[in-house]
């Protein structure tokens, strides 16, 4: 059974955590105003709406991250030669953000046996 869903807007990669030290103990956190929190919530809502439930067997996750191309990459005749071929965020951070969001819906992500992440520019 395949469940497909999409999340509007540009994908948000998992950021590096900030570290704070209190006494001898360090604490890692992501600031509350970071866009990743809204993105995770949007992914979880879309997954639930598509019918995703808790995973009890191995699952495959395919992430197709499509980014809007900035106007600065374009000319009247098409894409500038100097424009990057691929969007900036690393695919591992994009995959991590989606898996963290899906944990709210399907439980622990240890049931994910295959993760395929692709990134590209949209039209």
Regions inferred by a protein language model and the residue ranges of each:
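Acidic, proline/glycine-enriched N-terminal capping motif
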Residues: 1-123
């Amino acid at each position: 059974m395949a469940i497909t869903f999409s999340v509007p807007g540009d994908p948000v990669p998992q950021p590096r955590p900030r570290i704070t030290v209190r006494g001898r103990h360090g604490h890692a956190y992501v600031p509350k105003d970071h866009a990743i929190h809204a993105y995770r919530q949007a992914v979880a809502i879309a997954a639930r709406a598509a019918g995703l439930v808790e995973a009890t067997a191995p699952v495959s996750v395919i992430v197709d991250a499509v980014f809007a191309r900035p106007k600065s990459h374009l000319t009247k005749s098409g894409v500038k030669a100097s424009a990057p071929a691929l969007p900036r965020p690393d695919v591992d951070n994009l995959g991590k953000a989606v898996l963290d969001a899906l944990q709210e819906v399907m439980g622990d992500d240890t049931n994910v046996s295959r993760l395929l992440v692709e990134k590209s520019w949209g039209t």
